[in-house]
């Protein structure tokens, strides 16, 4: 069938993109779903920083590639071995397709699925193929179009593995439902799955993008006693305060990180730091801040996606002598079929 997609022609073109035009809307040919796959009509898609990370070459991927991964859609067709959704269902799209058989999947960590991660890196579906192609005028032009993260959501229609979709309550407005498969599960999941914060814990969130705000909502829902938010933009801090943050700290590019860390710690009990600090921006400096404001015995979680060459260094003795924990969180350490319905229910309860 014919579809229209936003196709990245080449990574790393110079900004402004309005001038270099790395993305072109193209008419493509979409092959029908295989036995384990579904055809989805995309309703809404979010623009996530992970899309930009591919465009600017921070996350190298093969091109040309149909972009988009944070979306909601309606099932139009199912393969004969699909039993988790049916035609007409509204679904949230998930950007790590899980195979269900590798060690990660069998131990309840589908976000780190070996097969799914390999397919994503190659720009293919879990079956090892692309379903998108285009007509070419020259034999040297690439015909195959790759799929971003098994979703390719910036399209009118897309084929995905059955494990890339989760049925959701159709009463949720699709413009909000679109973010549940990425920003929501990544931010909320970092708090409730990766860190597993306790009721009454003190929390800090460094970086207020979409994922950072979802972490804030997760900390509020989990019953954090105090929440410190840190960002470069005052408007984001103001919104975070309205949502329930206890303290808002404005950083600037000229701020000394050591001074900033000390000023944030002064907002905590006895100036020792917070129980849990979440790094949500994906940079070395923000992780240094998050680690620096974590109390002895506390936990630092990083869920931001940095450039592959970004380095972070700490004094090793602080891990040992202060019994610190430093954890990574990808896709909110979630099990999508379990967590997305839970978070949808929290949304319906105004949490």
Language model regions located:
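C-terminal substrate-binding/catalytic core of Rossmann-like NAD(P)-dependent dehydrogenases/reductases
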Residues: 2, 257-266, 270-271, 308-351
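Glycine-rich beta-strand-centered segment in the early N-terminal region that forms part
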Residues: 29-45, 55-106, 111, 119, ...
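NAD(P)H dinucleotide-binding glycine-rich loop of Rossmann-like/cofactor-binding domains
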Residues: 101-202, 206, 351
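Adenosine-nucleotide cofactor-binding segment
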Residues: 205-208, 220-287
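N-terminal Rossmann-fold NAD(P) dinucleotide-binding loop
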Residues: 212-213
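Helix-to-beta-strand junctions that scaffold the AdoMet/dcAdoMet cofactor pocket
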Residues: 294-295
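Glycine-centered, small-residue-biased loops immediately flanking beta-strands
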Residues: 298-299, 324
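Acidic carboxylate diad motif detector
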Residues: 303-304
């Amino acid at each position: 069938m014919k579809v229209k997609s936003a196709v990245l022609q080449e990574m790393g073109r110079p900004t402004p993109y309005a001038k270099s035009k790395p993305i072109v809307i193209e008419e493509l040919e979409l092959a029908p779903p295989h036995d384990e796959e579904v055809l989805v009509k995309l309703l809404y898609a979010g623009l996530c920083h992970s899309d930009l990370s591919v465009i600017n070459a921070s996350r190298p991927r093969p091109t040309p590639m149909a972009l988009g991964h944070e979306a909601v859609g309606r099932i139009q067709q199912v393969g004969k071995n699909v039993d988790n959704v049916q035609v007409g269902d509204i679904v949230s799209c998930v950007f790590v397709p899980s195979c269900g058989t590798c060690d990660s999947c069998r131990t309840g960590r589908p976000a780190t699925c070996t097969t799914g991660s390999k397919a994503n890196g190659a720009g293919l579906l879990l079956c090892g193929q692309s379903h998108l192609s285009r007509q070419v005028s020259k034999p040297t032009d690439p015909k195959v179009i790759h799929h971003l993260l098994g979703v390719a959501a910036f399209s009118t229609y897309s084929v995905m593995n059955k494990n890339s979709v989760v049925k959701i309550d159709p009463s949720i407005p699709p413009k909000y439902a679109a973010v549940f498969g990425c920003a929501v599960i990544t931010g909320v999941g970092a708090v409730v799955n990766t860190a597993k914060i306790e009721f009454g814990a003190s929390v800090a969130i460094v970086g207020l993008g979409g994922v950072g705000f979802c972490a804030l909502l997760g900390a509020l829902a989990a019953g954090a006693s105090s929440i410190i938010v840190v960002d470069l933009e005052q408007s984001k801090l103001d919104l975070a305060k309205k949502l329930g943050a206890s303290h808002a700290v404005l950083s600037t590019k000229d701020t000394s990180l050591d001074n900033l860390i000390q000023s944030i710690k002064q907002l905590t009990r006895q100036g020792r730091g917070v129980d849990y600090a979440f790094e949500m921006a994906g940079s070395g400096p923000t992780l240094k801040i998050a680690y620096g404001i974590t109390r002895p015995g506390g936990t630092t979680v990083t869920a931001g996606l940095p450039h592959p060459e970004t380095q972070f260094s700490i004094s090793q003795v602080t891990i040992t002598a202060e019994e610190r924990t430093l954890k990574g969180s990808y896709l909110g350490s979630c099990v999508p079929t379990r967590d997305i319905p839970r978070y949808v229910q929290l949304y319906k309860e105004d949490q």
